[in-house]
A protein has these predicted regions:
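A short, basic/flexible loop-to-alpha-helix module at the beginning of a structural domain
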Residues: 1-13
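N-terminal Rossmann NAD(P)H-binding glycine-rich loop of SDR-like oxidoreductase domains
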Residues: 16-33
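N-terminal Rossmann-fold cofactor-binding loop
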Residues: 43-47, 71
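Glycine-rich phosphate-binding loop and adjoining beta1-alpha1-beta2 segment
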Residues: 48-56
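Rossmann-fold cofactor-recognition segment
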Residues: 57-73
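Conserved Rossmann-fold cofactor-binding substructure of NAD(P)-dependent oxidoreductases
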Residues: 68-86, 90-93
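ADP-ribose/adenylate-binding Rossmann-like module
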Residues: 104-118
Length: 118
């Protein structure tokens, strides 16, 4: 598996921004990415569930960051994407949520994969 890694401003490398990280699919995906040694920026609407997930992953030695994000806000998305090479989105519904995320990824030049299970 090819590893995507970006280091910016002396911060820890963040490989993947995972939108919807605290959801059913997101938690499983975050765990799999962590097992593979990727640093995951866990992102979603509410900080509490993201921090809970980060603690669980950290107990297994995973490197994570937590970021709240509003996908309807371009500035919020741009901030969450800073320094990542790939955005994985598990948020839905796709028809309503994907457009702003795709636009932000195109603007930032970041790769995008939608994995919403709707």
């Amino acid at each position: 598996m090819a590893k995507i890694s970006v280091v910016s401003d002396g911060q820890a490398a963040v490989d993947v921004l995972l939108l919807g990280a605290a959801g059913n699919s997101g938690r499983l995906i975050a765990a799999e990415l962590a097992v593979r040694g990727l640093c995951v920026r866990l992102a979603g609407r509410r900080r509490g569930p993201l921090e809970d997930l980060a603690r669980v992953l950290a107990a297994d030695g995973a490197a994570t960051q937590v970021r709240t994000v509003d996908v309807s806000d371009a500035a919020s998305l741009a901030d969450a994407m800073a320094g990542v090479g790939l955005v994985l989105s598990s948020i839905g519904p796709f028809a309503r949520q994907a457009g702003p995320v795709i636009d932000a990824c195109l603007t930032a030049g970041v790769s995008y994969v939608d994995i919403a299970n709707e």
